[in-house]
Protein backbone atom coordinates (compact mmCIF):
# COMPACT_ATOMS: atom_id res chain seq x y z
CA UNK A 1 0.00 0.00 0.00
CA UNK A 2 2.83 2.36 0.94
CA UNK A 3 4.63 1.60 -2.33
CA UNK A 4 1.50 2.40 -4.32
CA UNK A 5 1.15 5.76 -2.52
CA UNK A 6 4.83 6.54 -3.10
CA UNK A 7 4.46 5.78 -6.81
CA UNK A 8 1.39 8.01 -7.03
CA UNK A 9 3.23 10.84 -5.24
CA UNK A 10 6.26 10.39 -7.53
CA UNK A 11 4.05 10.53 -10.62
CA UNK A 12 2.35 13.69 -9.32
CA UNK A 13 5.75 15.29 -8.70
CA UNK A 14 6.86 14.43 -12.25
CA UNK A 15 3.64 15.88 -13.67
CA UNK A 16 4.15 19.10 -11.68
CA UNK A 17 7.76 19.36 -12.91
CA UNK A 18 6.62 18.81 -16.51
CA UNK A 19 3.90 21.47 -16.19
CA UNK A 20 6.37 23.95 -14.67
CA UNK A 21 8.84 23.28 -17.50
CA UNK A 22 6.16 23.84 -20.14
CA UNK A 23 4.99 27.02 -18.41
CA UNK A 24 8.55 28.37 -18.23
CA UNK A 25 9.13 27.56 -21.91
CA UNK A 26 5.87 29.30 -22.89
CA UNK A 27 6.80 32.38 -20.85
CA UNK A 28 10.24 32.54 -22.45
CA UNK A 29 8.77 32.38 -25.96
CA UNK A 30 6.20 35.03 -25.08
CA UNK A 31 8.92 37.24 -23.66
CA UNK A 32 11.04 36.82 -26.79
CA UNK A 33 8.15 37.77 -29.08
CA UNK A 34 6.90 40.65 -27.00
CA UNK A 35 8.34 43.92 -28.26
CA UNK A 36 10.43 42.32 -31.03
CA UNK A 37 8.48 44.26 -33.69
CA UNK A 38 8.74 48.00 -33.08
CA UNK A 39 5.37 49.76 -32.78
CA UNK A 40 4.29 53.14 -34.13
CA UNK A 41 5.18 55.29 -31.10
CA UNK A 42 8.78 54.09 -31.03
CA UNK A 43 9.05 54.26 -34.82
CA UNK A 44 8.30 57.99 -34.77
CA UNK A 45 11.22 58.48 -32.38
CA UNK A 46 13.60 56.21 -34.30
CA UNK A 47 12.75 57.54 -37.77
CA UNK A 48 11.82 61.24 -37.39
CA UNK A 49 12.04 61.91 -41.14
CA UNK A 50 9.33 59.26 -41.69
CA UNK A 51 7.03 60.20 -38.81
CA UNK A 52 4.20 61.27 -41.14
CA UNK A 53 4.30 57.87 -42.87
CA UNK A 54 4.28 55.68 -39.75
CA UNK A 55 1.47 53.11 -39.80
CA UNK A 56 0.30 50.78 -37.02
CA UNK A 57 3.35 48.50 -37.00
CA UNK A 58 5.57 49.82 -39.74
CA UNK A 59 6.62 52.66 -42.01
CA UNK A 60 4.99 53.25 -45.38
CA UNK A 61 7.73 53.91 -47.94
CA UNK A 62 7.09 56.11 -50.97
CA UNK A 63 8.60 55.84 -54.44
CA UNK A 64 10.94 58.65 -55.39
CA UNK A 65 12.22 57.25 -58.70
CA UNK A 66 11.42 54.17 -60.76
CA UNK A 67 13.91 52.26 -62.94
CA UNK A 68 13.45 49.40 -65.39
CA UNK A 69 15.55 46.43 -66.47
CA UNK A 70 14.72 44.87 -69.82
CA UNK A 71 16.49 43.79 -72.98
CA UNK A 72 15.76 47.07 -74.71
CA UNK A 73 17.17 49.28 -71.94
CA UNK A 74 20.10 47.18 -70.68
CA UNK A 75 23.38 47.25 -72.61
CA UNK A 76 24.88 44.18 -70.88
CA UNK A 77 23.94 41.05 -68.96
CA UNK A 78 24.20 40.62 -65.20
CA UNK A 79 27.47 39.21 -63.80
CA UNK A 80 27.94 38.06 -60.20
CA UNK A 81 31.08 36.22 -59.05
CA UNK A 82 32.06 35.14 -62.59
CA UNK A 83 34.85 37.53 -63.56
CA UNK A 84 37.35 38.37 -60.81
CA UNK A 85 34.51 38.11 -58.31
CA UNK A 86 33.07 41.35 -59.70
CA UNK A 87 29.40 42.17 -59.21
CA UNK A 88 27.95 43.84 -62.27
CA UNK A 89 24.16 43.98 -62.43
CA UNK A 90 22.44 44.75 -65.72
CA UNK A 91 22.22 48.45 -66.41
CA UNK A 92 18.81 49.99 -65.92
CA UNK A 93 17.14 53.17 -67.04
CA UNK A 94 14.89 55.61 -65.24
CA UNK A 95 11.23 55.42 -66.16
CA UNK A 96 10.42 58.86 -67.54
CA UNK A 97 7.38 60.73 -66.29
CA UNK A 98 6.76 62.33 -69.70
CA UNK A 99 4.10 64.76 -68.51
CA UNK A 100 1.96 62.10 -66.84
CA UNK A 101 0.84 62.18 -63.22
CA UNK A 102 1.64 58.50 -62.67
CA UNK A 103 3.98 55.65 -63.62
CA UNK A 104 2.94 52.82 -65.93
CA UNK A 105 4.36 49.40 -65.05
CA UNK A 106 4.26 47.25 -68.15
CA UNK A 107 3.27 43.55 -67.97
CA UNK A 108 6.05 41.01 -67.26
CA UNK A 109 8.66 43.71 -66.61
CA UNK A 110 11.05 44.09 -63.67
CA UNK A 111 11.54 47.45 -61.95
CA UNK A 112 13.56 49.03 -59.18
CA UNK A 113 11.72 51.41 -56.86
CA UNK A 114 14.06 53.94 -55.29
CA UNK A 115 12.58 55.28 -52.07
CA UNK A 116 12.06 59.03 -51.89
CA UNK A 117 14.44 59.72 -48.97
CA UNK A 118 17.38 58.15 -47.12
CA UNK A 119 16.81 55.94 -44.09
CA UNK A 120 19.07 54.93 -41.21
CA UNK A 121 18.36 51.61 -39.49
CA UNK A 122 19.67 51.83 -35.91
CA UNK A 123 22.27 49.32 -34.79
CA UNK A 124 20.66 46.30 -33.16
CA UNK A 125 17.67 46.46 -35.52
CA UNK A 126 16.80 45.14 -38.97
CA UNK A 127 13.95 45.83 -41.37
CA UNK A 128 11.80 43.53 -43.47
CA UNK A 129 9.90 44.90 -46.46
CA UNK A 130 6.43 43.97 -47.66
CA UNK A 131 4.37 45.14 -50.60
CA UNK A 132 1.16 46.87 -49.56
CA UNK A 133 -1.76 44.53 -50.22
CA UNK A 134 -3.44 46.88 -52.71
CA UNK A 135 -0.52 46.44 -55.10
CA UNK A 136 -0.37 42.69 -54.51
CA UNK A 137 -3.95 42.49 -55.72
CA UNK A 138 -2.82 44.26 -58.90
CA UNK A 139 -0.33 41.48 -59.61
CA UNK A 140 2.84 43.21 -58.41
CA UNK A 141 5.49 41.19 -56.56
CA UNK A 142 8.14 42.67 -54.26
CA UNK A 143 11.45 40.80 -54.18
CA UNK A 144 12.63 39.62 -50.75
CA UNK A 145 14.89 42.06 -48.94
CA UNK A 146 16.20 42.77 -45.45
CA UNK A 147 17.58 46.12 -44.31
CA UNK A 148 20.71 45.37 -42.28
CA UNK A 149 21.64 46.76 -38.90
CA UNK A 150 23.16 50.27 -39.12
CA UNK A 151 22.37 50.61 -42.84
CA UNK A 152 22.31 54.24 -43.95
CA UNK A 153 21.20 55.24 -47.41
CA UNK A 154 18.39 55.22 -49.96
CA UNK A 155 16.64 51.88 -50.38
CA UNK A 156 16.14 50.48 -53.86
CA UNK A 157 13.80 47.49 -53.99
CA UNK A 158 12.80 45.22 -56.87
CA UNK A 159 9.21 45.05 -58.13
CA UNK A 160 7.89 42.69 -60.81
CA UNK A 161 4.61 43.15 -62.64
CA UNK A 162 3.47 39.54 -62.95
CA UNK A 163 0.07 40.44 -64.38
CA UNK A 164 -0.86 40.47 -68.09
CA UNK A 165 -1.98 44.12 -67.87
CA UNK A 166 -0.44 47.51 -67.17
CA UNK A 167 -0.42 48.76 -63.59
CA UNK A 168 -0.79 52.53 -63.20
CA UNK A 169 0.80 53.90 -60.03
CA UNK A 170 0.84 57.49 -58.80
CA UNK A 171 4.09 59.36 -58.25
CA UNK A 172 5.29 59.33 -54.63
CA UNK A 173 2.79 56.58 -53.86
CA UNK A 174 3.00 54.58 -50.62
CA UNK A 175 3.84 51.13 -51.96
CA UNK A 176 6.04 49.30 -49.43
CA UNK A 177 5.74 48.80 -45.69
CA UNK A 178 8.95 48.52 -43.65
CA UNK A 179 8.68 46.48 -40.45
CA UNK A 180 11.46 47.20 -37.94
CA UNK A 181 12.60 44.36 -35.68
CA UNK A 182 14.87 44.50 -32.65
CA UNK A 183 17.57 41.82 -32.79
CA UNK A 184 19.67 40.15 -30.11
CA UNK A 185 23.45 39.87 -30.22
CA UNK A 186 24.04 42.09 -33.24
CA UNK A 187 27.56 43.54 -33.11
CA UNK A 188 28.28 43.95 -36.84
CA UNK A 189 27.22 47.02 -38.81
CA UNK A 190 26.42 46.97 -42.52
CA UNK A 191 29.35 48.19 -44.61
CA UNK A 192 28.50 46.97 -48.11
CA UNK A 193 28.33 48.64 -51.51
CA UNK A 194 25.02 50.34 -50.78
CA UNK A 195 26.10 52.08 -47.57
CA UNK A 196 25.70 55.86 -47.89
CA UNK A 197 24.45 55.40 -51.49
CA UNK A 198 27.97 54.99 -52.86
CA UNK A 199 26.95 52.45 -55.53
CA UNK A 200 24.20 54.73 -56.85
CA UNK A 201 26.84 57.26 -57.82
CA UNK A 202 28.34 54.88 -60.39
CA UNK A 203 26.97 55.74 -63.81
CA UNK A 204 26.94 52.14 -65.03
CA UNK A 205 24.31 51.24 -62.46
CA UNK A 206 21.97 53.99 -63.60
CA UNK A 207 22.17 53.11 -67.28
CA UNK A 208 23.77 56.44 -68.09
What are these regions (language model features)?
Residues 4-208:
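DUTPase catalytic domain/fold
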Amino acid sequence: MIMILLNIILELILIVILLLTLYKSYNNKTRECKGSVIGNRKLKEMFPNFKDDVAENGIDLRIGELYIINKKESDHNGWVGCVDDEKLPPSYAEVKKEGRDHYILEPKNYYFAKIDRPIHIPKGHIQQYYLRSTFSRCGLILTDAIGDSDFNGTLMLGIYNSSPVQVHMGFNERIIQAVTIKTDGTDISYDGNYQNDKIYNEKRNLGQ
